[in-house]
Structure formats: structure tokens, C-alpha cells
Curated annotation (Swiss-Prot):
InterPro entries (alphabetical): AdoMetDC_fam_prok, S-AdoMet_deCO2ase_core, S-AdoMet_deCOase_pro-enz
Recorded family membership: Belongs to the prokaryotic AdoMetDC family. Type 1 subfamily.
Keyword hit for S-adenosyl-L-methionine: yes
Protein name: S-adenosylmethionine decarboxylase proenzyme
A Pfam match: AdoMet_dc
């Protein structure tokens, strides 16, 4: 039997209001709230403000990460949500971001990560990894 270790949502959000994505000050609370809405566990986050506009950010999660990059001049947000926890948590975080940013269109991909791992090769004794 094969197992997957996580789910990775990769999305391009088009037609987003530039006022929502021009500054890290505007978009960082949206991403922080998405983490909460997704029941994800934030370890740390970092946001960067580009000049004259645009922002990037990444949140390190206990489950993996959430990252984004914005191009306000195009109304574009590129987004990654990767979690090795409950798969529905990534969906909840994504749905929240869509609800708040209201893109006019979305290019969305969802991948099962590590899906070629065979269950019978799992190391269950931590001493075997030392």
C-alpha cells in the first residue's frame, strides 16, 4: 500500500484588488487569519515589503508552510499551502484566503506529496535512524 505524507495546494489568484495585496501590512493579517482558520500551527512568520509595492511572506508551520508573493500591478497573488497534517486544514486555509481576496479567477493545483512511499518501508524504530 502507498501513503502520502502531505498535501500541497499551489494556486495563482488573478483579479485581486490591488489595495489588499500592495503591502505586507495589508496582506499579512489575511495570511495569519488563514492559518487560524485552517487550524494550522504557526511556528514563525516573515513578511517582506517590496518598493514601491508588492509583498512576499512565509509562515513556517508545524505541519509545513504557507507562502505567498504578490504583484499588485497585475492583481496577482501566487500561493503555496503545504501541510503534512489533516488535509482538510489546507483546504480551510485556502478557502478563507479566497473568501477574503475575492479573485476573479484561480489557477489551482492540489498534489499529494510523497505519494510513492510504500507503507512497508516505514522505519518505526528511531534507533534505526541513528
Amino acid at each position: 500500500m502507498k501513503v502520502a505524507v502531505g498535501v500541497h495546494i499551489i494556486a495563482d489568484l488573478y483579479g485581486v484588488d490591488a489595495r489588499l495585496i500592495s503591502s505586507s501590512e495589508a496582506i499579512s493579517p489575511i495570511m495569519e487569519n488563514a492559518i487560524q482558520e485552517g487550524h494550522l500551527t504557526k511556528i514563525s512568520s516573515e513578511y517582506y515589503q517590496f518598493r514601491p509595492m508588492g509583498a512576499s511572506g512565509i509562515a513556517l508551520l508545524a505541519e509545513s508552510h504557507l507562502s505567498f508573493h504578490t504583484w499588485p500591478e497585475y492583481g496577482l497573488v501566487t500561493l503555496d499551502i503545504y501541510t503534512c497534517g489533516d488535509r482538510s486544514n489546507a483546504d480551510r486555509a485556502f478557502d478563507y484566503i479566497i473568501k477574503v481576496l475575492k479573485p476573479t479567477s484561480v489557477d489551482y493545483r492540489k498534489m499529494e506529496r510523497g505519494s510513492q512511499i510504500k507503507e512497508d518501508v516505514r522505519i518505526t524504530d528511531p534507533q534505526m535512524m541513528l
